[in-house]
Amino acid sequence: VSRDVVRSEHIGRQLPLFVGIGVVALAASVCAVRAAEPAAARGKALFEARCASCHGAGLAGGEFGPPLSGPSFAEHWRGQPPEALASFISSRMPPSAAGTLPPADAAALQAYILHADQAADGALAEKASAPGSAPAQAAATPPPAPGPARVEIRDPGLAEAKAGRLAPLAKLSPVTDAMLRRPADGDWLMWRRTYQTLGFSPLRQIDKTNVKALGSAWSWSLPASQNEITPLVHDGVMFVQSGDAVQALGAAKGDLLWQYVRALPETGSEARSTRVKTMAIYGDRLYAAFVDGHVVALDVKTGKPAWDHALLADADATNRGRADGVSYHLDGGPIIARGKVILGVSLGTDTPKGGCFIVALDARDGSEVWRFHTIAQPGEPGGDSWNGAPANERYGAGVWTPGSYDPDLNLVYFGTGNTYDVANLLEPRGGKVGPNDALYTDSTLALDADTGKLAWRFQHVHRDVWDLDWVFEQSLVDLNIGGKPRKLVVTGGKIALFDALDRATGKYAFSRDMGLQNLVLGVDPKTGEKRLNPALEPEAGKPKFMCPSPLGARNWPATAIDPASGILYVPMVEFCTNYSYSPRSPEQTAAGGVDISFSGMLPRPGNDGKFSRLTAMDLKTGKVIWTRRQRAPLASAMLATAGGIVFTGDRDRYFRALDQATGKVLWETRLDAAPSSFPVTFSSGGEQYVAVTTG
């Protein structure tokens, strides 16, 4: 677990480094005892004097603190002992002087919170009375009134300073469908900037001649998470999601404008270990997915929730995004298409109830529009491709990368992962092994954005039992191939072999192999069918040497493509592994899990001590333009710009600008932590910035 820092660099006078510590939000607990009215009245006065400036009067949430009422807050503390609330407040609040609040004051604040809940909907009392909790007691007298909706600032200087700091919010314009189709040059409105997911910006103020003057503009500490963060920028406001928090920052200075902190159950540490790659912005709302399986729409100017939708209705919120004991993840994040919020779901190695899925929600109210399951079910097209395994023994096909979208075709494109427990594909059923391609694992899926109907699918590798997903970015690029214009979707799996498909029909066009794998020996030039290395077929108890390792020659750090030149920039690592197949009992196989194991990461044969490479390849011809190799593995996605630069970061904490034409290092800086994220570039106040999240 790390504490992420978002940093912004720009050309011009080197500004002093601004370091801000993210606000630690107050969270209270559900207690089963309701205090007497006098204590609640005293707690109300204390709250308004000492807490409301962050949490807002009336417990509704403020600019710097989460709400202390409502069902989400109640779920956060369901089943806690009666003394938990006062103990937490006394020991943890206020963040700037934790432990200084007298126990009597903490008890009074607890009483106020519980009484105020009674006046609302009793969510705290209802949750406190859940199984395993002590029963709530009836209050003897009505609770005090919750107070005004906002805290009034009476100091003229403070009010003026606050108004100036919040000024960027007033300039925010609603994001339209037209903006999403063609974003303003200075904005970064979605994961890889545009629907095409190219990771390319038309900004050129920072170019090869002046990038050496790039200097620090500001930095800002974020709540702890595992990074893979993409900041979004619109009209000079940056939106960042880290762990259980969403923050709006002034893009030019890094000032905190508002934050939303989602109250999550305390079980486990998933809020800090989750990897949500992006949010989405549309109209006057920001759409964020959280580890508890909820998608939330937030007002872009205030951070106030507009709606909150649970993707799995039977999810047990006390178990952090688990349904029927099965974990699920929203690691990709949403994309907007024709008023719908569309995202994929991954459910881990013990996939339940039809498997992973892609879902579309109505952006207006969060209601579900459609759902597409990525594991073909018995009786459906592709349902006979699982070696006769029943539906509840089909695993994988996770969707943990955001999709892309072609507005002209109204198709969204998603990649899927491999299966996990492979014995159900390899072992005979009824005396023989049946068809076992395992659809729709390792596939590109093209879905109608309005209905979720499958338009076409292409499986890149059949029956992947080596954990070599094809789940990554689906890049939409127009290329001239053999004198003919082609509208293609290009994607590469962990083996760093890239397939190009016609994005209207899914017809195979060509493949480009980066040369770091030994699984695929050849590709049919007409169909794209892969001829796999028979020496790597699983044999029980027999280790086999395979390249790449299960972490892949490439993984989640996304590629970039210059749409004008058709040059693809690919970050890769050079590792191999020994893998073993260990079949388990039929009962264990049916229950899910894994039966392929790996020895870890091993150097490639003949390795010279360099374990990472960045390659620029002409997609039209397959010609490698240049390759830059180094010892430290690359850590960030690629960011290419019209200034002739490609930005990249590595595990050795360096963030670099390279010449797109040659791979030469033009500028570099060493950060406080590895930039394991998706760099973006934007403009504000007439200046171009580059932002990257570290940690």
Model-identified regions with their sequence ranges:
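Electrostatic cytochrome c docking/interface patches
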Residues: 31-46, 97, 175
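Sequence/structural segment immediately N-terminal to covalent heme-attachment motifs in c-type
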Residues: 38-61, 105
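Gly/Gly-Pro-rich "capping" loops immediately C-terminal to redox-active cysteine motifs
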Residues: 44, 57-90, 94
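Flexible coil segments in periplasmic/lumen-exposed cytochrome c-class electron-transfer proteins
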Residues: 48, 96-195
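Repeat-blade elements of multi-bladed beta-propeller folds
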Residues: 188-192, 224-245, 270-295, 325-358, ...
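Extracytoplasmic beta-rich repeat domains
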Residues: 219-232, 259-280, 308-333, 373-402, ...
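Short loop/turn segments that connect beta-strands within beta-propeller blades
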Residues: 251-253, 300-302, 363-365, 449-451, ...
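Beta-propeller blade signature
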Residues: 298, 355-367, 432-433, 437-451, ...
